[in-house]
């Protein structure tokens, strides 16, 4: 360069002065340094400053000159010429400079492009500094005047590169880039650095003329991203199809994860963040969606194998596309439901097989025996087994996934409430699932003192609550539970009050205080009865004529009639004379404390203990647990060894049916001998009943009361069996029907109350809306059928609470 700076008003001289410097800054064939540090070392500081000064002098001089104006052909505006001429010179120079690039035979276009791009962009930065004064004043003024075709020098370099180098050759460049991507996917060595630089150039060339600071990815997206995504889909479509022909689906799942891992790594190294989402969607389509049926089938195979690790891997793959989760949830729900149903069917089949080995029964009788002799523990444990298996799979493979959690709940609710045992084929639509009753019996086994430790060792209150949450007929469970709970309370057979209270609290937490209201009140009655018993015992001991012989121990229970599952039936019965003094004193004592209250005596539910010294001389007396009716009969034998049925009737005032039912256990265990024997003679007045003296039995403590619970004729002639091997009869079926009737009545009352509440608030409602709201409100207690709601509506219309609208499809509330 010349040692003398050019005249500041001479454009040609100024350009001729700075052109060699620009050439040196941008580089030539011999000067292709690829980093800023290397370029800085090559450039002469003196030359750099002279270029800057010459440009500065020219722009300043022109700005001071007057009368030098130019009219812009695009806008028609006049501008002081402080840079436009030298700007145009530079623009033309850059075009020619880039056009003169030559690709060698030894390099690919990608290599050529990247090498030139690196040097050119470094030079553009230095050049931008050299033209700093023009950028800050002339360019900025032009752009502020709305001339968006004027750019700072660095941007001008990039725009020229795009126009001259990139646009004509972009297809070649992109094809070579995509070839490199394919080679990388095939595990071959690729030009990693060149790929990265070329991609960055595409981002850099996305310039928005209206706003140079705004990121514009239009070039990157249109030129590279779209063909890249298309190529990706084509490549992996072919790859996955070929892979699945030679490998198992399980192997494919792990391969798909590896592909995704590699592509995500490449994403962070090469591609712009904008590609992340569309690339993920493209991979999801070709790796997952296109093979979803195979993956769903494999899901079933893995569930069969209970292979949690592989299920987790499959879920991790499928969840990448959230739209596929409902399909996976549907497969999971159907599988769990079917498995639960099959497990119960297998349990029943095994149970039937065991019965057939021991009994010769016709199909109808076999079905009845199976239904009434299946162990509640076996049944509930089988339900829990299925639930626990799939809960574990859920918790370890896809925790917190809402659709799959819902699928598990739906499936468990389905097979727990509806299976071959709970609702056998042909059951009426109004039938209640037997699961509620079986869970109540399971609870009874757990909470009963008499249950052997080895039986209860693997049972817990958690089991009860787990199944309870899935019950659709929670009111049926409450009814059965309350009946068994009542027996435990009045017979004192509960393991402990704490255990009972714990279950009540957990049931309350799982449902509502209202749900356990009756059970809680029953518990309170027992506590108050204990206080009454203690007070009565103290009062008796204060009697002047007190003796244990005159006042035997008495354990009274005072129960609220509408809370307990016992229906009062007046029974003609003469209380044994040995119990009359205690009975009279109790009535007197209670009346004094609770004036006006009426006591109704439930004689059929009373039990007691008798000491019988009727064994061989020297043997300890027997302890008999008996019903009150049995006690009344046995006490008659203090005065005679042989009694006729007529004698017993006179002594007890009991009906023949009650006497016969009480006698069955005595005859069965040979405490009493019937003469003549046989069913027909059992109910004849002249039949004699002789007490066995001396009585021979291995046990000292004998429970005769338990044998009274079944129908007399069935007990003697054979029939079904309960869970403990006792013979079953018609009373059991009658009791089931009675419970079902009670449930239906309570449900009718509940639904009517629901309808009144709803209609009182809404006043007028269409039929469908009323039915749906009523079903929704009853969901926590039972699964209300439409027919049940219709009956309740009809009942309320008859009672005058509702009236049908003129359209026949709506109802109005009558205040």
Curated annotation (Swiss-Prot):
It comes from the Eukaryota. Keywords: Cell cycle, Cell division, Cytoplasm, Isopeptide bond, Nucleus, Ubl conjugation. GO terms for cellular component: chromosome, telomeric region; cytoplasm; nucleus; SCF ubiquitin ligase complex. Pfam families: Cullin (PF00888), Cullin_Nedd8 (PF10557). GO terms for molecular function: DNA replication origin binding; protein-macromolecule adaptor activity; ubiquitin protein ligase binding. PROSITE patterns: CULLIN_1, CULLIN_2. Neddylated; enhancing the ubiquitin-ligase activity. Residues 448-748 are annotated as: Required for interaction with CDC34/UBC3. The keyword Membrane does not apply. Belongs to the cullin family. PANTHER family: CULLIN (PTHR11932). Core component of multiple cullin-RING-based SCF (SKP1-CUL1-F-box) E3 ubiquitin-protein ligase complexes which mediate the ubiquitination and subsequent proteasomal degradation of target proteins. As a scaffold protein may contribute to catalysis through positioning of the substrate and the ubiquitin-conjugating enzyme. The SCF complex associates with CDC34 as the E2 ubiquitin-conjugating enzyme. The functional specificity of the SCF complex depends on the type of F-box protein. Component of multiple SCF (SKP1-CUL1-F-box) E3 ubiquitin-protein ligase complexes formed of CUL1, SKP1/HRT1, RBX1 and a variable F-box domain-containing protein as substrate-specific adapter. Component of the SCF(CDC4) complex containing CDC4. Component of the SCF(MET30) complex containing MET30. Component of the SCF(GRR1) complex containing GRR1. Component of the probable SCF(DIA2) complex containing DIA2. Component of the probable SCF(YDR131C) complex containing YDR131C. Component of the probable SCF(YDR306C) complex containing YDR306C. This is Cell division control protein 53. The lineage of its organism: Eukaryota, Fungi, Dikarya, Ascomycota, Saccharomycotina.
